[in-house]
Amino acid sequence: MRIIGVSNFLVDDLENLLFNCRIKPIVNQIILHIGNTNLPLVDFCKKNNILVEAYSPIAHGEALKDDRIVKRAEKYKVTPAKLCIRYVLQLGAVALPKSSTLEHRKENRDVDFPMDDADREKLKKRKDFSGYGEFGYFPVFGDKNRA
């Protein structure tokens, strides 16, 4: 085995894995979107050259119904989905939006617009859209003693 990826690993989990592994993970797939942004985890992954892959970048569709996100998307003349995807990309993560139609998949690729720093900082501070798809607390490596 030469390459591994992990899913839903928190900082403690990754620290212990990195301390004990021979093969470092190249990707950590986590829930990451406006309203649920674990910046310490994203920063830890960046510092350790672990790519963050964001599943559900539009909050399982909840973000599409949020008036504040809709209004901010209008400012950039994009859909709320595009704004959400762009937000994740500007954090340095890869976005994996779910889409059931070819039209939406094509639309989701067109996210080449700049989001200003002030808007991005406001979005980082939002703490809603949680509790609907959380993976919960399930220690993988974090609570175990290091070898």
Question: Where do the protein language model's features map onto the residues?
Answer:
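Beta/alpha (TIM)-barrel catalytic core signal, keyed to glycine-rich beta->alpha loops juxtaposed to Asp/Glu
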Residues: 1-147
